Amino acid sequence: MSHKVSSCEVIVVGGGVIGAACARAAALRGLQVALCEPGPDRAAASPASAGMLAAQIEPADDAMRGLGVRGRDLYETLAPALLETTGLDIGFWRAGIASIAFDDGAADHLRDAVAQQRQAGLRCDWLEAEDLAERFPGAAPNARGALFAPEDGAVDPAALTRALLADGGRLGVSLLPERVLRIVTAEKQARVTGVALADRTVSAEHVVIAAGAWSPGIGGLPRPLPVEPVRGQMAAAPWPSGTPPAILYCDHGYVLSRGSEALMGSTMEHAGFDGRITDAGIAQIVDGATRLLPALATTPPTRTWAGLRPVTPDGRPIVGRDPETQGLWFATGHGRNGILLAALTGDIIGDLLAHGESEVDISPFAPAR
């Protein structure tokens, strides 16, 4: 997959899950694609993610909810497709997610959310405390109840990224393990002509900026990009013996089972590009996880890590064409929803590049909004 390329039709900047999805989708539509990724940053968002597909769980406006549900549902077909073409299992698990209320106010809020989601045609249930205890033994004994979204779930983010990159390579994507210093334009920034690397320029008709929290640092962009890093700390511990696998969520955190581990998260910290772990952050995570699954109190974390999410001021990703520079596209700013929206973002960018339009209304996510 790694090649010395001097020109192509599309250059994707960033090899995390969003960039990998965009590169694969463009190649799938017959375009000649190169993906620039100098190497994984220890604080990158994709490998740090737990991989929840929580389209119906986290607070969202109508535009984000619709995008999330659509993105989640794509994994139903993407997972077997990637398994067939690459032999890689992305760990798609449609287990359902329970969002648990620990007080009456939270319970009332979640009951309202169940009613609203049902009215919108989504599958969503309210579990009384006794129903929750029966469905999720050992979970949240002090709960007042839970919203249960049976079609939500999870994927393994690392496996997903590897599979997207592998399938991209099968489709002809060239991997350039180099850092993009700046985009190159002509006609007073009216048109993209490629990207500048440390030792050369690679020509292209289209450049897709998909470098997550590092996107604003790419030189030559026509205007400041409103994306900032937000640190999310994570921890893992052994999944309690005898406890059925589950994905549990509340206002204080979440816990999900993957293999023999309990993945616990996560903080939301404005710490710049500081990807360090803190005692306070891990304590916060463990406290939230043990509220959801008290058996975790006896098993201290076996590993900890952090990632830097790319977050925008309005919480929506930036997806689509630059309003002024022809051939410049953005797929960044996904915040906590990068894994959830990766496949859909790839399809949107692929359709825009190949056909000039997408069947998805991306006006709420446009760079010019």
Model regions: which residues?
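Helix-loop-beta segment of a Rossmann-like dinucleotide-binding subdomain
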Residues: 88-101, 113, 120, 124-171, ...
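Active-site substrate-recognition segment that forms the wall
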Residues: 21-29, 38, 51-53, 57, ...
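Short loop/edge segments at beta-strand edges and connector loops
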Residues: 37, 128-129, 176-179, 303-305
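Dinucleotide-binding Rossmann-like beta1-alpha1 core, especially the glycine-rich loop
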Residues: 51-135, 288-290
